[in-house]
Amino acid sequence: MPFFIILTARWRFGDYLLFIMETRTYDELKETPETKKNNARAALSEFAYLGGYKPWNFRKEALEYLAIKKALSEKWSFDGEAEDSYSILDNYLRYTFFRLFEENKIEYTKDGKWACFNTGLVNQTYVPIYALFQKNRNTGKQPWYFCAFIADGEKWGKFPDRCSVADFPRRPRRAQYLDNPSDLLYLVSEEKNELSLNFDHIFDRAERLPIDLLNELSGKQIPIKKQRGDFSNQIDYETYLSNYNDELQNVINEGNTRRRLQERFKTAVDMTRDRIVWNYKTAIPMYYPSTGKISLLLPLNLVKEDKVDLALVVSKGDGGYLAETIYPLNWAYRCARLICRPDSDWLTPSTITNDSEDEEDND
């Protein structure tokens, strides 16, 4: 039975780190609550060996083949990234797999030798593209290993070990995110659809706010947030983030800064609502993997009127819309891309830098 070594606890004693590890089978792992909450992104790597230099990464050649030669043309990297990083594509495939796993849409051949899932992507003639896996013969590893991206009518492998989509009892289906088409739209014409802002929760994520905005409203000079690469280990980085956020919270709660910040948000939201009236595509649907929720993304111009700084995450309830948190634009794009490629004039990878680290599981 394949098993995985899982980090379950860690403590720090002076300059030493103590790690507590345990082993679990794949079936045990997929049933644990933390898998859904914390490991949505890791689910595909736990399911299959992906062939990369690091075993949890795709081979670069595989992503390149999919992006350039197989799938309909699309930009899969953010501004400032190498074109061949394919960070958006990698993220898309991982969370698409997790959604399909939740929906029980991973398909298997009757002999148990092959597995397959629908990537949701299409080729130049709009034929669906699938990810194909073969049973892993290496014991103690992931139960499957990645073989190829194939379209309908294509076979992979050497005789007699060849496989196509037609060999599966059921054609792999796409991930489903929407039950109600109205979830795609932000309705501004009805009074019952007023937008409420949960400022307490929004400002709890103070490190996501533009530093220029906080400096302007507080009259201070706050240092720019450091990145993970500035620290030798994850624990030191997490400690720094906690302290940095506490510092920003103190700035927000001093004097009139909080009131000014709320007023700036309200002004930005008013402009966004006018923008939605002008173009309903301004509001972009997104899927939040760890909760399975559909929300809408709205642009927030907080510092300059001609520049979007953040995405406001809005959910619809019986009494209207509620804005509970804010996302950096790279997070927003990745979550939106799971549903479809955004047809947007404000959320495009060519104008977004990937300078916020992957913490989407923390809303």
Region annotations inferred by a language model:
Residues 5-8:
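Ser/Thr/Pro/Gly-rich low-complexity, intrinsically disordered segments
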